[in-house]
Each structure stands twice: as structure tokens, then as C-alpha cells.
Amino acid sequence: MSRVCQVTGKRPAVGNNRSHAMNATKRRFLPNLHTHRFWVESEKRFVTLRLTAKGMRIIDKKGIDAVLADIRARGEKI
């Protein structure tokens, strides 16, 4: 499974670790992903999404039905 939020589209970013001597080594900044199951009343079923903490806040604000409509409009299968 890829490390991509299904709501926000956030992906891993690449940057540097910096030591005290300012030596740079490559590293990845991973998104704060969680697998979360939501009850969708309109479909009478659970939907499992892999999303970040910010994605959960967006669902709290807009509602699961609106977010699912956005995801399906992008062509993702849920």
C-alpha cells in the first residue's frame, strides 16, 4: 500500500537529516497516516480509508458523504 492520504493526497517528502556538524544525509518525511473505518449512512456500509490526521479533520468539517464524492470524482475506487 502506498503512503498517500486518500483525502488530501499528501505523500512522503524528501529532505535532509542535519548533524551537529551540519552534515547532510537524505531522509523521508512520512505523512501521519492512519487506516480508519467510517460508517456511511447513505450507503449503509463501512468505508475504510487511509488518511492523515488532517484528512480526518476535513471529514469532520465537510462530512463523509462530501469527501467520498470528491474522492470518486478523482476516479479513485472506494
UniProtKB/Swiss-Prot annotation:
Superkingdom of this protein's organism: Bacteria
Gene Ontology molecular functions: structural constituent of ribosome
Pfam families from the UniProt entry: Ribosomal_L28
UniProt keyword terms in alphabetical order: Ribonucleoprotein, Ribosomal protein
A GO term from the CC aspect: cytosolic large ribosomal subunit
GO BP, sorted A to Z: translation
InterPro entries tied to this protein: Ribosomal_bL28, Ribosomal_bL28/bL31-like_sf, Ribosomal_bL28_bact-type, Ribosomal_bL28_sf
Keyword Membrane: no
Matching PANTHER family: 39S RIBOSOMAL PROTEIN L28, MITOCHONDRIAL, LARGE RIBOSOMAL SUBUNIT PROTEIN BL28M
HAMAP family noted in UniProt: Ribosomal_bL28
Stated family: Belongs to the bacterial ribosomal protein bL28 family.
NCBIfam families referenced in this protein's UniProt entry, alphabetically: L28
Official protein name in the record: Large ribosomal subunit protein bL28
Lineage: Bacteria, Pseudomonadati, Pseudomonadota, Gammaproteobacteria, Pasteurellales
Gene behind this protein: rpmB
